[in-house]
Swiss-Prot record:
<feature type="compositionally biased region" description="Acidic residues">
    <location>
        <begin position="318"/>
        <end position="327"/>
    </location>
</feature>
<feature type="region of interest" description="Disordered">
    <location>
        <begin position="96"/>
        <end position="168"/>
    </location>
</feature>
<dbReference type="Pfam" id="PF12485">
    <property type="entry name" value="SPIDER"/>
</dbReference>
<dbReference type="GO" id="GO:0001782">
    <property type="term" value="P:B cell homeostasis"/>
</dbReference>
<dbReference type="GO" id="GO:0043367">
    <property type="term" value="P:CD4-positive, alpha-beta T cell differentiation"/>
</dbReference>
<feature type="modified residue" description="Phosphothreonine">
    <location>
        <position position="112"/>
    </location>
</feature>
<feature type="modified residue" description="Phosphoserine">
    <location>
        <position position="320"/>
    </location>
</feature>
<keyword id="KW-0597">Phosphoprotein</keyword>
<dbReference type="InterPro" id="IPR013761">
    <property type="entry name" value="SAM/pointed_sf"/>
</dbReference>
<dbReference type="GO" id="GO:0042100">
    <property type="term" value="P:B cell proliferation"/>
</dbReference>
<dbReference type="Pfam" id="PF07653">
    <property type="entry name" value="SH3_2"/>
</dbReference>
<comment type="function">
    <text>May function as a signaling adapter protein in lymphocytes.</text>
</comment>
<feature type="region of interest" description="Disordered">
    <location>
        <begin position="318"/>
        <end position="380"/>
    </location>
</feature>
<feature type="modified residue" description="Phosphoserine">
    <location>
        <position position="113"/>
    </location>
</feature>
<dbReference type="InterPro" id="IPR001660">
    <property type="entry name" value="SAM"/>
</dbReference>
<dbReference type="GO" id="GO:0032760">
    <property type="term" value="P:positive regulation of tumor necrosis factor production"/>
</dbReference>
<dbReference type="GO" id="GO:0030890">
    <property type="term" value="P:positive regulation of B cell proliferation"/>
</dbReference>
Amino acid sequence: MLRRKPSNASDKEPTQKKKLSLQRSSSFKDFAKSKPSSPVVSEKEFNLDDNIPEDDSGVLTPEDSGKSGKKLGKKWRAVISRTMNRKMGKMMVKALSEEMGDTLEEGSASPTSPDCSLDSPGPEKMALAFTEQEEREPPSLSRQTSTGSELCSPGPGSGSFLEESPAPQYTGPFCGRARVHTDFTPSPYDHDSLKLQKGDVIQIVEKPPVGTWLGLLNGKLGSFKFIYVDVLPEEAVGPVRPSRRQSKGKRPKPKTLHELLERIGLEEHTSTLLLNGYQTLEDFKELRETHLNELNIMDPQHRAKLLTAAELLLDYDTGSEEAEEGAESSQEPVAHTVSEPKVDIPRDSGCFEGSESGRDEAELAGTEEQLQGLSLSGAP
């Protein structure tokens, strides 16, 4: 008698139970169980059709269901992060390719940054490199995308903001100079103090009463303590400058009339003046406007030059004579005082009375004379 093959209804029920338990374990995790200390992501490629091991009875134990749920959760997270990283990488590559296309169209008007060389890969190669990098190292792609914009920035002034413009050097005013007598090296964290070496000369800018002065040394403006320096005495510049100007501006007095006329540029009148008696500078001093009329010199510029030269020559001689007289007069009283001998003048100290002794001597002399006169008159 033929037996009927049993139906597979009993076999289907365990599989349905397994699917339900799998879905529940993946959606609702076992929160009561502690997490592993060092979870390791499986390097196998994720496949939803993987067979899950089961025991002999065909029903999963709670421990197996928890482990499978954790594995699925980790795999889902890896898939999501991988897809997001790929999307972000593609967006960054697209943005970079657009920027590079714009710069290539504009031309090489502005120099590119030094980080980008001329042999840099095109946008397609960069896209391929990004995708390969994503497949090899999915976790570190977020860092690469965050720093991807810094790899090649075609901006014209990428490093210009790093270059600081040099500060203009201080040129004055100064209130004195000081020489360093003790070496001083400031702390490396103190950028305002000057490094002092013995013998350095500092141009003092400010001398506050606190004791920390401001000065210029070797082109650097900074502070220093006054105890390390000696203030140099200021040079008497005022009276010296006029004498230098006078010595530079003053020419020596001309010795001949021809030399004087050469200086004022009127050599053409040399023969006229010599023929009419103006042979020396002493004669030229007496030149007046009427004399020029007699000499037939009618050019107003020439007349003015000749008259001015005569007046200056006269003033020069009179000034030198007065200076010589003043020097002689200043030397005479000194010689007089030196040549005078010192005379000792007796002074009465007041201790002795000399008037009575003098009177007694005078009376004695008078009596002697009277006696002599009487004796002469009484003689026969």
